[in-house]
Amino acid sequence: MAFLNVASSRLLSKTLQLGGRVQNCTATCTAATRNFHFSVYGRKDTSAKLSDSISTQYPVVDHDFDAVVVGAGGAGLRAAFGLSEAGFNTACITKLFPTRSHTVAAQGGINAALGNMEDDDWRWHFYDTVKGSDWLGDQDAIHYMTEQAPASVIELENYGMPFSRTEQGKIYQRAFGGQSLKFGKGGQAHRCCCVADRTGHSLLHTLYGRSLRYDTSYFVEYFALDLLMENGECRGVIALCMEDGSIHRFRAKNTVIATGGYGRTFFSCTSAHTCTGDGTAMVTRAGLPCQDLEFVQFHPTGIYGAGCLITEGCRGEGGILINSEGERFMERYAPVAKDLASRDVVSRSMTIEIREGRGCGKDKDHVYLQLHHLPPSQLASRLPGISETAMIFAGVDVTKEPIPVLPTVHYNMGGIPTNYKGQVITHVNGEDRVVPGLYACGEAASASVHGANRLGANSLLDLVVFGRACALSIAESCKPGEPVPSIKENAGEESVANLDKLRFTNGSTRTSELRINMQKTMQNHAAVFRTGSVLKEGCEKLSAINSTMDDIKTFDRGIVWNTDLVETLELQNLMLCALQTIYGAEARKESRGAHAREDYKVRIDEYDYSKPIQGQQKKSFSEHWRKHTLSYVDGKGKVSLEYRPVIDTTLNEDCVSVPPAIRSY
């Protein structure tokens, strides 16, 4: 159902001055088409009103809501309909239609200790996640996530998610990397609930279908520009309607950032082109910190030459990695877990095989993932999407030949720092402080449940658990219909000025050229293995690229569906994420999880955990690296770093914290 506000219809018929010339801007939307927002069952936005306080060149509309969610992937949808279900007047702003969000690309599954394949316990899942994080994960948040996991999966089942089934009718659970029984002593766990190899697709459509039951107002194809901050509080967001070029200020008591990751900072990645770190950059521009951005996960099995994801579920179903000699080489690197070691371990092992001359193909620059020893019926029922993807992108029939694969950027462990309730935090004078009115969840956030390395199938769990946590936290502290905090009349003025500047900029370098330079710099200088000299050179190169942003050239001077402008705004966001990633990596003088330094090959904790700690002198906070990086970027692109302690305590005595130890599989 589309509708048109009276104030909105008047708005677009006003005369606008664009780029120094007066143009008559007739209404681009009529009652027969979508105007300012698209709603299936959402409330009619009677609060929308015209404003000329920040621009006489662009139509500006002000809206009031109890809560605003930015992003409509798995985390954003779960937060949005959770808020609407609790009675909050909620807006969900998204730059693309909800079911086109990148959650749709997740393949393998969602972890939960249901115990359908063997006895399982959420505390074992907790242990595996802490170990997988290389002891950089916050154990209170990991406790919350893993304890909530079984109920979250059952909730999805009740929403209608069509999980794969065992012969007994239970939810089928496959093996995934880094998952064990009995605190690592009971063998491989089967904990990953799946819908064949299209779990993300099913999850996203299930959540979107569920969301239509509630009174959520969806603002589809709206590009969020910046947070509206007043006196250290978040009071909403400002966004561009890409369909007609109008500017919208959303005033709200609570704002949830669920904008996903920033995989497109790298040249080769599994991320959609829309994964541009928009929320992460918005927080950075607001003067707030980001956390642990140097930890970037390289998925072991991206299709060679294409980067498309081949799910870890392939190895969970029995697939193996082989080198040019036909050797199952993971037996040498992870004697127990083998091909189901954690992703950082497998990616490094593959890279070493290639470096030492045992790569496959004429250039010996990749390895093979072998599936053809598995029954064709198993491939057809459990991995149908992979069979199709391998044929399209690699020309491989998986029933007869192996898939050429190479580690590819896949996930960002770092993000906007939050506590386990989803509240965004800063670190002031040695203490965590909540940013009033601001929440984050999903890949955009760092709770930190993934620490230095995420376990496969914990990401979809992260989405639903912390999307729900944001809604619950807001419902605990606020009531629907409470007065919306005020904003300054000129709030968002800088955002509109930046947009206008980019729209008419006429420098010498195209957006696409700058973007590819940034991506190749990140790919070449912050890859699977890193060294100080290469990272330092990468920092210098990236800062130089960032300094040329003022010399950028755009071509489209229009305002309706100006994709040139939107891609340039996305490049600004990517650049802020890339700068913090590479500077954080250069500063971290150790190897931990996905951050592997060849010049600092060991993990540096407060104690040497390879030996008994009795008699050891505890290192001071400044001497060890078991701490979170907090990064800031000023208006000139200068990165500054601080650090905050890892939380080692759990929520209660139901779960005992896991002390650091040597991490092996």
Swiss-Prot record:
Q: What does this protein do?
A: Flavoprotein (FP) subunit of succinate dehydrogenase (SDH) that is involved in complex II of the mitochondrial electron transport chain and is responsible for transferring electrons from succinate to ubiquinone (coenzyme Q). SDH also oxidizes malate to the non-canonical enol form of oxaloacetate, enol-oxaloacetate. Enol-oxaloacetate, which is a potent inhibitor of the succinate dehydrogenase activity, is further isomerized into keto-oxaloacetate.
Task: Report the main location listed first in the record.
Answer: mitochondrion
The record's EC number reads 1.3.5.1, 1.1.5.-
Q: Which residues form a coiled coil?
A: none
Q: Which family does it belong to?
A: Belongs to the FAD-dependent oxidoreductase 2 family. FRD/SDH subfamily.
The opening ranks of the lineage are: Eukaryota, Metazoa, Chordata, Craniata, Vertebrata
User: Where is this protein's transit peptide?
Assistant: 1-45
Q: Which Gene Ontology MF annotations are present? A: flavin adenine dinucleotide binding; succinate dehydrogenase (quinone) activity
Record protein name field? Succinate dehydrogenase [ubiquinone] flavoprotein subunit, mitochondrial
